[in-house]
A protein has these predicted regions:
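Proline-centered loop/turn at the N-terminus of a beta-strand
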Residues: 38-40, 60, 140, 171, ...
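Mg2+-dependent phosphoryl-transfer enzymes with acidic/Ser/Thr/Gly-rich catalytic loops
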Residues: 22, 159-244
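Conserved acidic, metal-coordinating active-site core of Asp-based
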Residues: 101-198
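Asp-based phosphoryl-transfer active-site loop
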Residues: 1-15, 41
Length: 244
């Protein structure tokens, strides 16, 4: 069982640092651990943030779109990203200087995100600046909800993370709400088509900001984080009732 964080088990908030998993989501994930072979959160957030914001022992954490993972309580960065960490830091400095009125989020040195949720009229200008800075530093720009992120140009995304997590499993579910989750959906579809997964379920966590493609590709749609929490609780309850 694999889930996204923001907008899936946590509400979308103006200040990214204040986001926390819904208490009912914590309980449901804790109940699922031991029932599923793997219960994981696959997110664009740093794993140390996820550990604090979710606080569920035994949960597998993959962050930074697959560039970071938690191992034995320690954040481990993909070695392929390390040569670009200096460029990420320099880009963050420039973005803070050029966009002083917007939130520039430094993500444990691995990525940097510019947010305009509280200033929606600044979106176009922010995108122009972010893309220019990305080009100057050899980084890649990605669109997210009311934000744009710079990452190392490394072939890693939620899809590659999901492929590693489900390797050898007979089935997998992934739940997400944003454009970056489409890569996870595509990975499950590829694995199922290749016969590497017997069952693959893609769950769209709907909202007014959810991409149309996400809803179109989903096998199941739920209404926001509360809807996903209800589904997770149903799965946990069904597993408890099923004889072993």
């Amino acid at each position: 069982m694999l889930v996204d964080f923001d907008g899936s088990i946590s509400a979308i908030v103006d200040d990214p640092a204040s986001a926390r998993a819904l208490p009912a989501a914590r309980d449901a994930l804790a109940d699922l651990i031991g029932t599923f072979e793997t219960v994981a959160v696959v997110s664009g957030r740093p794993v140390e943030f996820l550990a604090r914001a979710i606080d569920v022992p035994g949960l597998t954490l993959v962050g930074q779109y697959g560039l970071e993972r938690m191992e034995d309580g320690r954040a481990v960065v993909d070695a392929r990203a390390e040569p670009y960490l200096g460029a990420v830091a320099a880009a963050a400095d420039e973005l803070e200087g050029e966009l002083p009125d917007l939130l520039v989020e430094r993500k444990a040195g691995v990525a940097v995100t510019v947010h305009w949720r509280t200033s929606p009229d600044r979106g176009s200008a922010a995108i122009e600046v972010v893309d220019r800075v990305a080009s100057r530093h050899g980084l890649t720009a990605y669109a997210t909800k009311m934000a744009r992120e710079l990452r190392p140009p490394v072939p890693a995304d939620k899809g590659t993370a999901v492929e590693l997590l489900v390797d050898g499993s007979s089935g997998a579910c992934f739940a997400g709400d944003d454009r970056g989750d489409l890569d996870a959906f595509a990975a499950l579809a590829r694995l199922a088509a290749a016969g590497r997964l017997e069952h693959a379920v893609r769950i769209a966590v709907g909202s007014a900001e959810a991409p149309a493609e996400l809803l179109a590709q989903a096998d199941v749609a739920v209404d926001g984080p509360p809807g996903l929490v209800s589904l997770l609780k149903e799965l946990a309850g069904a597993a408890t009732r099923t004889p072993r």
